[in-house]
Amino acid sequence: MADLEAANINHDNHLLLDQPCLRLPYELLRKNFRSVHYPFEWDSTSVKNVVKETANGLISGKASPQDAVENLDQMLVKMRGLKRKLTAAAKEEDRLYRQMDSRVAHLRELADLHTVDDVRYEAWSRQRLDRLLVDYMLRHGYDSSAIALADERGMRDLVDIDTFVVMSRIRKSLEGGSVQEALNWCNENKKELRKMQSNLEFLLRCQQYIEMMRTDSPAKMAEAIHHARKYITPFTETYPVEISSIAGLLAYRPGTISEPYASLYSASRWQKLADTFVEAHLKLLGLPMTPLLHIALSSGLSALKTPACHSTQLQVPTQPEESQPVNGAGDGAATATAAAASSTTSTAIPHHHHGTASLTTRVCPICSTELNALARSVRYAHHGKSRLLEQDLVLLPNGRVYGKARLDEYAAKSGLPAGQIKDLVTGEVFSGEEGRKVFVT
């Protein structure tokens, strides 16, 4: 019964992971609408006013026919410009709707699946893995590789290449020491950033001021003061401490060791600006800061993680393959005890191998070099049900648990007198009366 439940697909959990897949096109549709809504309202009102003024001027005789023609020409220029904006917005809207249709269809395929044993589930999960890999590469700046994978798998509409390419370009410009593209982005999203209470624009303006102060040119210093009055002073009530610090740069030149001025001149601020931009960009679009691939891996890592996985120096016994303690699923405490207690016949290595099995076949995934750091911050899994690998469990005085049949069999193989039992790992010998029966609830 438990195996059948484990094979069932939990659609709610899948949708939690795939939520950004649907959220981003929706957020981009809203942004696309806002980008043309205000220009449309502004230009429409302007054209109506010009038409009204021209008509009234002709009727009253205050405007000549030549003036009317010039006004009409101006209206035509505005309307043509508005038409170009609306056409571009309509194309973008069609693209986003196409993406949403593809993503809904992709998730609908999952809704039609009920167990992981379905042959269609493997193909679907493989496509999702490819999508998560593309997301990971885009977040880390591997744009060419991400685009190549998306094109090879034919899933352009399932990933957000254009959005992340723009983010990557602006991030690289900040890392290269330029704030202009980031400021343009802030200007496009000024209202949303203000609602988020983001300090990105303030930090960018401060960096412009710092770069002006970095030179010894009196003209540049005068320009920096003018820049501060225009762009930084409006933030006085919000960031008084920061503004006081950057004002002190007038007295402290580059190369100073006095803090906080030395940190303000530090080149590492560019990387901090890039990180702040990425954080604001993802938050604006409702995307998680952690790559979706890490989120997906974390659930599996949590199921496998035990308290012994991040011990700095654990002992791995050199007992034969058959000498393994009984570890049920999720029995992290028993595993940790087993690893720690095996000090008499063991070899010290950096990572443990859960259950003291063969060093070549029983390597814990959590202890692998690739996943150990990622799993460090993952919580231990909650196991609501116990699964017994052996019946009639016996607790030895040293805290280890084994099946009674295996203890008796191992005692016989070891040639022990009747009534004695031997720990399969440590080799400790106990009286059979010292073992306590274990009842798992």
UniProtKB/Swiss-Prot annotation:
The keyword Membrane does not apply. A zinc finger (RING-Gid-type) spans 364-426. It is found in: Cytoplasm; Nucleus. Its main location: cytoplasm. Residues 163-220 form the CTLH domain. Residues 312-326 have a biased composition (Polar residues). The keyword rRNA-binding does not apply. Residues 312-354 are annotated as: Disordered. Keywords: Cytoplasm, Metal-binding, Nucleus, Zinc, Zinc-finger. Disulfide bonds: none annotated. SMART domains: CRA, CTLH. GO terms for molecular function: ubiquitin protein ligase activity; zinc ion binding. One of its GO terms (cellular component) is nucleus. Residues 333-348 have a biased composition (Low complexity). GO terms for biological process: negative regulation of gluconeogenesis; proteasome-mediated ubiquitin-dependent protein catabolic process. Pfam families: CTLH. Residues 125-157 form the LisH domain. PROSITE patterns: CTLH (PS50897), LISH (PS50896), ZF_RING_GID (PS51867). Involved in the proteasome-dependent degradation of fructose-1,6-bisphosphatase. PANTHER family: E3 UBIQUITIN-PROTEIN TRANSFERASE MAEA, MACROPHAGE ERYTHROBLAST ATTACHER-RELATED. This is Protein FYV10.
